[in-house]
C-alpha cells in the first residue's frame, strides 16, 4: 500500500484502540462506582512486577523511555484482591508515568516486602504533580481520558489497599500502593492461587491492553 493508505490504516487502528480503551475504562468505572460485587481472592502480588518487566522492551523501543524494575526482599507475597483489577491498576500507573515523560525519560517500578505486606511504587522523572491535590482534582491519567485516577482509587478502596501520590525527590511523581498480607499469609505453599488456564487468559489480556496503551502513548 502507498504511504497515504498506510497512514489511513494506522489512524484507524489508533482510533479503534482509543475507543476500545475508553469503553473498557468507562465500564470498569461503572462497575466500581455502583458497587458491583467482586470476589476477592489471594494472589501473588510479585506477579505484577514480572508483568512490568515484560513491558519494558516494547516501551523503550516505541517511546524511547526506560522502564526499570526492582524487587527488594520479595519472593512469594500473597495479598487479597481481584488479580484483573490489580493488573489494571498497574497499567494505569505505568501509563500515567510514561505520559509524564519525554523521550529519554525514565520510569521505575519497584516492589518491597514488609512485615505487614508489600509496597508497589511506580515513579517517573517527568513533569511532576500539579499544585492541586491530584486525587481530589482527577489528575490527567491515560492520555487525558480522565478516568484512570478514579479507577485506581476505587480499585484500592474496595480491596483495602492504600494509594498515595507524592512528588518524587529529584523531580517527577511517585505513586505508591500498599498491599496488606492476606490473613497473615496463612496460605499453604502448595495451594494453587489460580488455575493455569485462568492465568494464561489473564496474561494474554494484560499483554493486549499493554500493547494498546503503548500504541496510544506513541501518538500522544
Regions of interest found by a model, annotated:
Residues 96-98:
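Short helix-loop "hinge" at the ATP-lid/N-box region of the Bergerat-fold HATPase_c
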Residues 14-19:
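Short alpha-helical segment of the dimerization/phosphotransfer core of two-component systems
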Residues 41-54:
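A conserved beta-strand-to-alpha-helix junction within the catalytic ATP-binding
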Residues 34-39, 76-81:
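Conserved micro-motifs of the catalytic ATP-binding
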Residues 124:
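Acidic ATP/Mg2+-coordinating residue in the GHKL
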Residues 104-116:
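Short beta-strand/loop element within the Bergerat-fold HATPase_c
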